[in-house]
Amino acid sequence: MPNLSGLKTEISSVRNISKITNAMQLVASAKLRKISKKVIDTHNYVSEVYSLFNDIIRQTDKSVFLKESNFKANKTLWVVINSNLGLCGGYNSNVNKLVLQNLKLEDEIFAIGSKAVSFFRSKKIKIKNQITDIDINFTNKKARSISNDLLDMYINHEFDEIKIVYTKFINNVTFEPAIIRIFPIIKLENNFKHSQSLVFEPDAEQILSSTILIYINAIIYGTIIESQVSEQASRRTAMENATNNGKNLEQTLSLKYNRQRQGAITQEISEIVSGANNKS
């Protein structure tokens, strides 16, 4: 006799898991709506800071923060942004894979998110610092704390290059890992948005030194917010796919159950009829 009770249990398990993934999809959607409101403002702010600082560095060649475009780093600190939670598709693995592709022997990791901590610890890669207090409520205050740490490391020559690896948000279904160099700052060419009308006093070099923390903070805050949006979008997509797959599997198992149940009933009827005929 077919194992109908086993199939029934399996159908029930799949149905319950689908309910859980659907609930997680709804939670991720709500978080995505909440944090998406910050993205446009953050993009505009970071863009303006980038443009302004490019204008500043175009007018100085002596700052400790500047290097030529052919600069080669011996030791790099990689600031890696992951999530604290799983079930978000390839969000973490794509970022970590990009880091591993570029990592040198002497490099170290500044891990943001518990998944980054556990991943690079498992790879026996040195973690210089770690931050796990990160979610959709990430604030500028927290970003400033990270920015201060990075600035101190660079000024004290612990690293000759600092890069951040995050997930760039393109739209609700498209996001990709990306790298931004924080230090040293490489001059960008052909940016005349502000430079033709701005005059820096006392001079661009002093202004750069006194406001460099604004530059770092804009990058840290912007990339973490963008990564948070990407995380929630990735989790929503992953849970939506899991829910749909669960429903499809439930339908397949239900069809199999009904066929086996129908076969079992038909067999029982045949046995009853056969027994009645034998008695007659």
UniProtKB/Swiss-Prot annotation:
CDD domains: F1-ATPase_gamma (cd12151). Keywords: ATP synthesis, Cell membrane, CF(1), Hydrogen ion transport, Ion transport, Membrane, Transport. GO terms for biological process: proton motive force-driven plasma membrane ATP synthesis. It is found in: Cell membrane. One of its GO terms (cellular component) is plasma membrane. It comes from the Bacteria. Its main location: membrane. It is a peripheral membrane protein. One of its GO terms (molecular function) is proton-transporting ATP synthase activity, rotational mechanism. Produces ATP from ADP in the presence of a proton gradient across the membrane. The gamma chain is believed to be important in regulating ATPase activity and the flow of protons through the CF(0) complex. F-type ATPases have 2 components, CF(1) - the catalytic core - and CF(0) - the membrane proton channel. CF(1) has five subunits: alpha(3), beta(3), gamma(1), delta(1), epsilon(1). CF(0) has three main subunits: a, b and c. Belongs to the ATPase gamma chain family. This is ATP synthase gamma chain. It comes from Mycoplasma capricolum subsp. capricolum (strain California kid / ATCC 27343 / NCTC 10154).
